[in-house]
Structure formats: structure tokens, C-alpha cells
């Protein structure tokens, strides 16, 4: 794993560019979306056959498939899923916002009305892999928010079936509307509807570049959570950290994808050299060695700063999806961290704890967007309406000022809207 010393000037070049896809990929996605809008289920079936190599006549998961999923899933794993649900729900319930109102002395009442979205569509990656954790992390905040209709889509395997873990996770949350479809065609079906699926108000969940581009295309007609890029981890550590643990944590993200980013930031060259050697050692025995090696080679790096203050500045420049702080006193550094999707404090809080079990959401901003965005949360499934109720006395007191403001902007009809009421009051 390559090692670099880092200075203030060099930090400016660290930001990773966002993969917006090629023009050919964007054209393909637009074509798929238009086809689904025009031809509905027929188009979805056609693309499922083309891309997933399976003919699916009826994409809706049946009651029998749910029953088979429960039968085939190990009882221990069922308990793990249920415990994770409890943890995730407990955390997200603390995010729930309520409507509020207040009154001024002149009789004015102002407020904010909080309302859950009517519907949401969740995309869960599938095909060759299974991600029941994605079901939990996307569905639970929507349920806590009060979303009434939640639809889930996920690509089928080559046998036309879905992962038992995914089905059981959904069933444990009361989600029955699950459709075997993936890719840009599934995003289009959620956004615009087909004969089988009613359109939804918001689409969440990660996917490949075609899913990401499709979400970008439909945004505005529906809401989306974010455009997720490859997974990222930054580990910030001092000489008190254990090198083998740091290496294991870096590789936990490197094995996700050849495009995943794994970065170690420290103020100790000795630790940097030991961790680099440990990464190479652990790579040799990884089942997903080819993927992890490509990630480490192309997007992995160890940055050595002169001081911990400079190391923290490097972290804030990177604005990573996941940040682990493994130092003598990680809590003391927390206040200096400005930009990170999720922050894991101490050696007993490695990133997989948050991926699956702790409670906070694992749908996190990537590609440096933690500078201005947040993890998926309950408020993403709520919307707010401003409430304004002026009393007659308040209106009379401020009417002249409001009309003057309208004319300042050259909007005469606005001013007359105010004055029409003034005249009626004065009669």
C-alpha cells in the first residue's frame, strides 16, 4: 500500500471526482426510462431477460416464496435480523420530527406541519449478492416516518429467486410488495409506474452506475436519497493503534468493489509502514483478493502528516463516507471532525458494526459529499409545510409595510392583494 507524506498544498488535490458515467451510459439509461414509460411491464420484462438472463412473467414475490425463505434461513440468522431491526428502529425513532406552532402577542399563529410521504420505493442490490442490511436501513426510517406504502425492488438471481435473507428482512418489517426487477428499468418503474407497480414519491437505495444514472434522470419527477458512489473508508490513528486491526478495517471496504477507496491517515511513519506491510499480508488470504487488491492499488493510500492537527485537516478534506478514529482519546478529536458520513470512535467500533447492527443508517454520502449532506434518516421521508395565520389586528398593523415591499419588487398585484383587504376593513 503506497505511503505519502501530506502537506497543506497537497491536501487540495485529494478530493475524489464523482463518476457521472459516460455519455453512452447516460443515453442507454434515458432510452430504458423512455421505454418503460411507454411500454410498462413489457419493457421491464424485456430488460430483465436481457440483463439478468431470466424470464420473469410475474415479478411480484408470492406468499409461498416468503414461506420458503423462512424455512431455508438459519434460525440464528433470523434472530440476528430481529436484533438488528430493534437497534435500527430505536436509533431512528429519535430522529422523528413533529409539527410545531407558536403565537405572537398580536394574534398571529405560525408553525410547521410535518407530514410523512405517501409512498417510497426501495432499491436493494441483488443478483449475485444479497444485502438484507440494505432492506433494514432503507425501510425502517420510512416506517418510523409513517410512510404508508413502501415498495421494494431487487434483481433476481439466475434461478429467478431472491435471497432468503432479503425476503425475511422485508417480511419482518411488514413489506409484502417486493418485485423481481433491477437496473435502470426498476428505477423507471418506481418513478413512473407500470401496469403492476404504482409510482412512488421517493426512491432510495444503492446500485450500480446504471441505477445511479437512472436516479439522477428521474429526480425532479420523484425525490431520491442521493447518488451513491463506491464505498469509502478513512482510518485516522496514532501510534497506540494496532496495525493488524487497521489493515483489516481498510480491507473491509476494499473487498466491496474495485472502485472502493481505503485510506489511512496518521502522524506516525513507523505505524504507516507497519500497516502497509500488514495490508499486503492480509490480502493474500482474502476470498475476494482480486477485488481488494485492485481497490488498494488504485484507490488506497496511507497519508502521513507532521501532526495530528494536520492529519485531521486531511480527513476533513477527504470528507469520507466512513471515518474510524483509533487514537488514545478518540472522543477528544470528535469536535474537530467537520466532514464525515459516519464516525466510528475507538478500536471496538469498526465499520462493520455500523454496517449491520449498531443502529445508525449505513446509507451514507460518498465522493466527498459529506461536506454538505447527511446519512439517510427519518426526515428524508417527511416533508414540511409552513403554516401562516394572521389575525385582523396583525394584518392591519403590517399591511402598509407588506404592500410597500411588494412594490419594491415591482409586483403591483401583490400590493393590491393586501390593499383590497385594507379597504374592506376600513369600511
Curated annotation (Swiss-Prot):
Gene source species: Bacillus subtilis (strain 168)
Cofactors demanded by this protein: Zn(2+)
Protein name as it appears in the record: Histidinol dehydrogenase
Residues binding Zn(2+): 253, 256, 355, 414
Residues that, per the record, bind substrate: 231, 253, 256, 322, 355, 409, 414
Gene3D superfamilies from the UniProt entry: 1.20.5.1300, Nitrogenase molybdenum iron protein domain
Family under the similarity heading: Belongs to the histidinol dehydrogenase family.
Keywords on record: Amino-acid biosynthesis, Histidine biosynthesis, Metal-binding, NAD, Oxidoreductase, Zinc
Known role: Catalyzes the sequential NAD-dependent oxidations of L-histidinol to L-histidinaldehyde and then to L-histidine.
Molecular function via GO: histidinol dehydrogenase activity; NAD binding; zinc ion binding
GO (cellular component) term, any one: cytoplasm
BP-aspect Gene Ontology terms: L-histidine biosynthetic process
Pathway: Amino-acid biosynthesis; L-histidine biosynthesis; L-histidine from 5-phospho-alpha-D-ribose 1-diphosphate: step 9/9
Entries under PROSITE patterns matching the protein: HISOL_DEHYDROGENASE (PS00611)
Gene: hisD
PANTHER family: HISTIDINE BIOSYNTHESIS TRIFUNCTIONAL PROTEIN, HISTIDINOL DEHYDROGENASE HDH
Catalytic activity, EC: 1.1.1.23
EC class: oxidoreductase
Note accompanying the cofactor annotation: Binds 1 zinc ion per subunit.
Catalytic activity: L-histidinol + 2 NAD(+) + H2O = L-histidine + 2 NADH + 3 H(+)
Source organism, top-level taxon: Bacteria
Active site, per annotation: 321 (proton acceptor), 322 (proton acceptor)
Residues annotated as binding NAD(+): 123, 185, 208
Amino acid at each position: 500500500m503506497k505511503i505519502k507524506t501530506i502537506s497543506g498544498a497537497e491536501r487540495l488535490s485529494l478530493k475524489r471526482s464523482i463518476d457521472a458515467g459516460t455519455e453512452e451510459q447516460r443515453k442507454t439509461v434515458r432510452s430504458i426510462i423512455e421505454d418503460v414509460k411507454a411500454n410498462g411491464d413489457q419493457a421491464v420484462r424485456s430488460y430483465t431477460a436481457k440483463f439478468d438472463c431470466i424470464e420473469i412473467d410475474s415479478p411480484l414475490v408470492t406468499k409461498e416464496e416468503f414461506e420458503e425463505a423462512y424455512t431455508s434461513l438459519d434460525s440464528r440468522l433470523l434472530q440476528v435480523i430481529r436484533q438488528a431491526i430493534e437497534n435500527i428502529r430505536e436509533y431512528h425513532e429519535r430522529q422523528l420530527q413533529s409539527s410545531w406552532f407558536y403565537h405572537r402577542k398580536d394574534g398571529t399563529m405560525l408553525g410547521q406541519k410535518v407530514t410523512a410521504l405517501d409512498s417510497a420505493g426501495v432499491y436493494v442490490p441483488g443478483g449475485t449478492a444479497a444485502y438484507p442490511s440494505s432492506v433494514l436501513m432503507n425501510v425502517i426510517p420510512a416506517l418510523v416516518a409513517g410512510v404508508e406504502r413502501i415498495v421494494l425492488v431487487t434483481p433476481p438471481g439466475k434461478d429467478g429467486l431472491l435471497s432468503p435473507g432479503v425476503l425475511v428482512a422485508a417480511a419482518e418489517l411488514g413489506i409484502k410488495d417486493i418485485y423481481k426487477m433491477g437496473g435502470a428499468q426498476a428505477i423507471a418503474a418506481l418513478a413512473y409506474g407500470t401496469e403492476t407497480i404504482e409510482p412512488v414519491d421517493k426512491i432510495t437505495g444503492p446500485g450500480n452506475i446504471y441505477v445511479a444514472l437512472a436516479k439522477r434522470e428521474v429526480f425532479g419527477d420523484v425525490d431520491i436519497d442521493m447518488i451513491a458512489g463506491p464505498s469509502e473508508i478513512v482510518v485516522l490513528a496514532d501510534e497506540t493503534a494496532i496495525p493488524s486491526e487497521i489493515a483489516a478495517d481498510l480491507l473491509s471496504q476494499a473487498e466491496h468493489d474495485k472502485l472502493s477507496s481505503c485510506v489511512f491517515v496518521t502522524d506516525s511513519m513507523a505505524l504507516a509502514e507497519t500497516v502497509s506491510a500488514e495490508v499486503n499480508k492480509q490480502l493474500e488470504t482474502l476470498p475476494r483478493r482480486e477485488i481488494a487488491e485492485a481497490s488498494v492499488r488504485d484507490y488506497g493510500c496511507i497519508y502521513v502528516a507532521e501532526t495530528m492537527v494536520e492529519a485531521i485537516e486531511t480527513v476533513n478534506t477527504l470528507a469520507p463516507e466512513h471515518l474510524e478514529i483509533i487514537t488514545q482519546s478518540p472522543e477528544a478529536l470528535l469536535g474537530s471532525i467537520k466532514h464525515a458520513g459516519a464516525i466510528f470512535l475507538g478500536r471496538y467500533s469498526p465499520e462493520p458494526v455500523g454496517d449491520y447492527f449498531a443502529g445508525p443508517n449505513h446509507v451514507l454520502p460518498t465522493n466527498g459529499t459529506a461536506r454538505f449532506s447527511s446519512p439517510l434518516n427519518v426526515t428524508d421521508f417527511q416533508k414540511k409545510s409552513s403554516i401562516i395565520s394572521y389575525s385582523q389586528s396583525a394584518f392591519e398593523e403590517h399591511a402598509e409595510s407588506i404592500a410597500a415591499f411588494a412594490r419594491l419588487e415591482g409586483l403591483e398585484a401583490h400590493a393590491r392583494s393586501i390593499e383590497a383587504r385594507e379597504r374592506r376593513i376600513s369600511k
